[in-house]
Regions:
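Short, solvent-exposed amphipathic alpha-helical segments in soluble enzyme
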Residues: 1-2, 28-30, 76-88, 145-150
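Conformationally flexible catalytic loops at phosphate/diphosphate-handling active centers
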Residues: 2-59
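Short beta-strand segments
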Residues: 12-16, 66, 132-134, 158
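Short internal beta-strands
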Residues: 14, 88-95, 155-158
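Glycine-rich beta-alpha junction loops
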Residues: 15-21, 69-71, 137, 161
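Short, well-ordered secondary-structure micro-motifs
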Residues: 23-26, 76, 104, 167
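Anionic-ligand anchoring segments at beta-strand to alpha-helix junctions in alpha/beta enzyme folds, i.e.
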Residues: 45-46, 52-130
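Glycine-rich, acidic loop regions that bind phosphate or pyrophosphate groups
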Residues: 97-171
């Protein structure tokens, strides 16, 4: 349940050592009701932020869509592809985002970051707008934050609101 709710991912189950001892007997009393804790982030966009994002997209001359593993986890690959085609913006992926946008699509410019392609890294560096979707903007992509996409505005879209502006402030 926890691994699949909110922001899906691995879960640690920590069992105390004494519970695994073969000679110990621990009576377990089942509760009448169980309340499962989970992480349920707000999934509805803020209308003011959406309007601001649309304005930035309309003004952009050199935009790039930067898609990460969150697109795959969120099962949003089809929506990403439709959006990229509608806007006619180039798309780059992180390593964890590979496969969320067709690699054979003419708008795909390759993987970015320290192990990415020259073309995708230069497109990002020279962009005036970055639309980061399901991406953490971690150091594998940004390297030195102060020099990352120096002339670009940033739209950051993520299912986890605590990820937005965590490493780089979104506009």
């Amino acid at each position: 349940y926890l691994a699949e709710s909110g922001r899906p991912g691995p879960v640690v189950i920590d069992i105390p050592k004494d519970m695994t001892m073969p000679n110990q007997k621990f009576p377990y009393i089942y509760p009448e009701r169980i309340k499962m804790r989970s992480y349920n982030p707000v999934k509805k966009g803020h209308s003011g932020q959406i309007r601001k994002a649309v304005t930035l997209m309309m003004q952009a001359k050199k935009p790039v869509i930067y898609a990460g593993g969150g697109v795959i986890l969120g099962r949003a690959s089809d929506e990403l592809t439709k959006m990229a085609h509608l806007l006619n913006f180039p798309v780059t992926n992180t390593l964890m985002g590979l496969g969320c946008f067709p690699g054979t699509d003419e708008q795909f410019i390759g993987m970015l970051g320290m192990h990415g392609t020259y073309e995708s890294n230069m497109a990002m560096h020279n962009a005036d707008l970055i639309i980061a979707i399901g991406a953490r903007l971690d150091d594998r992509v940004t390297n030195k934050v102060s020099k990352f996409c120096p002339d670009a505005k940033l739209i950051h879209i993520d299912i986890d609101p605590t990820t937005i502006s965590k490493h780089i402030a979104a506009d």
